Amino acid sequence: MNNIELLKNGIEGFNIDTNDSMLEKFKIYREILVDWNKKMNLTGIEDEKEVYIKHFLDSISAVKNGYIKNGMSIIDVGTGAGFPGIPLKICLDSLELTLLDSLNKRINFLEEVSRVLELDNVTFIHGRAEDFGKNEDYREKYDVATARAVAGLPILMEFCVPFVKVGGYFICLKGPNANLELEESQKAIDVLGLEYIEKIDVELPEVDLNHNILVFKKVMETPVKYPRKAGKPAKNPIK
């Protein structure tokens, strides 16, 4: 099986129909990623098969169990090289996607990817979640907030949850320590207005990686004091 077939089968395993145009977009995305990675640090993974599995399929796995659907508004917080937001957008082309990152160089990269791939309804925010989570144009405006960052779960919650509408979802892609992080997040869940829904185990082809998706529903408005000022959530997480 070649790499594009591996990607195709993986996407279809998440109950998403593929076509040649979609698969070509993923191929080009990876090429742009590798090219830009020469001048800035976007990823430690460049090999085609590894990018397809560990970045693209891992990102797309966020659709499992139906919390993300076409037509929804999504904000990807701390998106970095565009994960999971851009792979989700390629697969579900009527998503309204907002990509937020604190580094302008990464925003420039994301704008270039979106331009080349002709992705519509993508908004770019250069800034910190702590600042934009207070902005009434963005606060509690999204059906879903996603994160695939390395920060601890209570920190990610404070970054992401203020963006989510009541009734919407916070979906966090995590590694093997998801259960431990969940235990450490009970106070943040209560304070920020969340209800824990489920942990979804993700199996990716040809890699021995234990990935999990944590799903939370927003059941009440987030208190106005959150998010706290830039730097505070990381220095003093809600615990």
Model segments located where?
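Conserved SAM/SAH cofactor-binding pocket of Class I
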Residues: 60-151, 157
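Conserved beta-strand signature within the Rossmann-like core of class I S-adenosyl-L-methionine
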Residues: 167-177
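Helix-to-beta-strand junctions that scaffold the AdoMet/dcAdoMet cofactor pocket
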Residues: 92, 164-166
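SAM/dcSAM-binding transferase cores
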Residues: 183-239
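Class I SAM-dependent transferase core
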Residues: 2-71, 75, 108-122
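Short alpha-helix immediately C-terminal to the canonical SAM-binding loop
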Residues: 106-108, 178, 182
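Residue-level signal for inorganic ion chemistry
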Residues: 33, 88, 174, 216
